[in-house]
Amino acid sequence: EIYSCDWSSDVCSSDLNACIEKSPLFTQGEIPRLREFIKKHLKQGDHKEVLYLIENGRIRPSKSLQDCISSMLDGNQEFTMLDTQKVVFEEILYMARLCQKDKRKRVMIAKGGSGTGKSVIAVNAVVNLLKEDMFGQYITKNAAPRNVYINRLAGKMKKNKIKSLFAAPDKFYQQQPNDYDFLIVDEAHRLREKSGMFQKGENQIQELISSSLFTVFFIDPYQRVHFRDFGSISEFQKQAQLQNAEVIQYELHSQFRCNGSDGYIAWIRNMLQLEETANFNFKDISFDFRVIDDPNELRAMICEKNDESGKARILAGYCWEWEKAGRSDPNHDDIVIGDFKMSWNLDAGDPYAISQGSVHQVGCIHTTQGLEFDYVGVIIGEDLRYENNELVTDYRQRAKTDSSVKGLKKLYRENPEKAKHIERQIILNTYYTLMTRGMKGCYIYCCDSELQKYIKMSIADA
């Protein structure tokens, strides 16, 4: 086996020793070792036939991986699709098969708001395409969904068996054109222009489209929450056109989070001044939304809900430092509001969303975006206030450990108008995302008393 990647720590795991003995494995940086292996086992020439087979061989998912994933989704309620989601799912399968048949590059853009089932469709598509002998991966910038899905899908299997199905978008600048049959990109609004802290590559979107015969982008424009977030429908279209790829677009309308209330989603967008929407009556929905005056009361309510299902969490805007010294200490208090004290999520163990004790820690946008709970308690920090009859965003109230606003200070010096627009988008989208993580309810507490009053009035007026 030859792997042109730098995942040697995974593929060379001691768990795979027996397999590697039968099928020698070479990873990036081991060219001299591969050269010696070829010299040893190919004693005479064959008119370059072996080299041709290596160069033109098609990468396929292994039989053991296909056997492993065949039962992963069976009976798993969290990945069960509804009829409206199945329409997009079936179209993905059809387009992927068509690409295999005519070898034409295609890009699908699927737009959908919170709770429309983007991730459910994405995971189902990856599993089913692999079962059809196609080679591809589930891609997302945010590590939280990847880690949670690996845990939930693995079940009793070793996680290493399915870990290779999930990847970040940072390595594709190293790939050759059409190395993959398909790539399913979830949370595509979080893609960056360049990769990693060293800004490698040219354009992540261009690199993903180039690397795959068929690329699917799932996007929610209201969930761009980082200064460097680059993914947009217009950029997907532009990069697809530059590579002569056919573009197919879908929009997912019905949402199944927030007790299926499209009205609640619309109200949140309207209340956060993201867009003007028609008001609705809170009495008409069963979603449990409340404004709580004391963060200690909010914590007690969420703990009570968590006792029922294990799926309730407290989330907050990133306005408190995540101190390095306390990241593994559950008794370290990062967030202090009067006599209310809690720590941010711990930097160890299981992913925050499914860790057994994480109800006693506070999650942020980076540990919860792309995931859902039954109930969420959201603490809105001083980065969002209500002054002079309007919402005011203030990136200076964000913690220094929050990288999502890095770059704004410089941009404010160069282009204040653009900086203000991006700042507002980041902060409002962050709270929109946090407030739409709950399936059954959302309780909020605002550090700014005027914002607390504004939201209460918005409920009364609805």
Where are these predicted regions, by residue range?
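Single conserved hydrophobic/aromatic residue that forms the stacking wall/gate
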Residues: 2-11
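Interdomain "pre-motor" coupling segment immediately N-terminal to P-loop NTPase/helicase cores
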Residues: 10-67
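N-terminal pre-P-loop "Q-motif" helix
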Residues: 62, 77-106
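Hydrophobic anchor at the beta1->P-loop junction of P-loop NTPases
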Residues: 110
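Conserved lysine of the Walker
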Residues: 118
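Conserved helicase/translocase motor-coupling segment
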Residues: 122, 226-231, 245-266, 273-390
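Conserved P-loop NTPase catalytic core
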Residues: 158-305, 310
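C-terminal accessory regions
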Residues: 216, 361-365, 369-462
